């Protein structure tokens, strides 16, 4: 796993991929679908994780860290109209505080929305979307561990986009001869 170390010998930050002595994760997941007639379809997914990492030869600062964290994701699709085929999708995601080596990873989350228009007998789809509406999806990890003191600030970006998909259809899988395995006998 890649992690950062501030050298005690000179003013330098060292990013290096290391194998930890020990890493263990235990988790549980629940997924709850929910539907109201044909106009609302939703799914809530909850995940809980216990995470343990240990490294006795991590430079001059061995660590043994444990953290419980949770993840929640919700997907919602609203059918605004069937003729024309118009759907609104709103998704949300949140991740509580976690660890990675000596890093502390802060809480993060995002909300995305998309408006989907299907036409041409279901062969064409026009999709307008906005990802990370509130600009909260990017984390700024930090280290406050023994002699290490680092704060990273990363920017979040809202993304707008348009996509178009057309299904040409008519694909039929070719019939193929079976593999000759007689030589393996």
Segments the model singles out, each with a brief description of its role:
Residues 2-3, 54, 137-139:
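A short, polar/proline- and glycine-enriched secondary-structure boundary/capping micro-motif
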Residues 9-16, 55-60, 95-98, 144-148:
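Extracytoplasmic loops and strand-loop junctions of Gram-negative outer membrane beta-barrel proteins
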Residues 17-19, 31, 63, 102, ...:
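A general structural-boundary detector
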Residues 65-185:
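Conserved C-terminal beta-signal and adjacent last beta-strands/turns
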